């Protein structure tokens, strides 16, 4: 029951047109979320991958995709740790370090997106250049 309720809540957020949903190279994350909570990503509204916007803001070639750590350092002057990225995310409960890692990854995306858009605007560029 708890898993179904969680899936329904996540699904409502994903379908909400008024809620900004940002990711960073997030295709795999969405696939894993769908596998864990079947149906929760069906009908997702406005999920934006911030990575291409960051790439454009940093003036990188279209084939170059910066990592989140590099993007945060370059656009926000913030150093984030990626140590937990390769830890065991299947094990439960998640460790305190994993929770902090996940929260940091999620909470940094809005300021990162704003910084990338601001840099593009100051250079009179669009995110798809």
Positions of the model-derived regions?
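Acidic two-metal-ion nuclease catalytic site recognized across multiple nuclease folds
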Residues: 108-129
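Conserved DEDDh/DEDDy metal-dependent 3′-5′ exonuclease domain
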Residues: 1-115
């Amino acid at each position: 029951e708890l898993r179904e309720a969680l899936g329904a809540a996540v699904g409502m957020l994903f379908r909400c047109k008024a809620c900004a949903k940002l990711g960073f190279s997030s295709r795999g994350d969405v696939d894993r979320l769908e596998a864990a909570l079947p149906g929760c990503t069906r009908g997702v509204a406005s999920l934006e991958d911030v990575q291409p916007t960051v790439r454009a803001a940093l003036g990188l070639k279209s084939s170059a995709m910066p990592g989140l750590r590099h993007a945060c350092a370059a656009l926000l002057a913030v150093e984030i740790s990626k140590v937990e990225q390769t830890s065991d995310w299947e094990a439960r409960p998640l460790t305190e370090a994993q929770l902090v890692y996940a929260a940091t990854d999620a909470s940094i995306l809005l300021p990162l997106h704003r910084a990338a858009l601001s840099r593009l605007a100051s250079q009179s560029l669009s995110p798809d250049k």
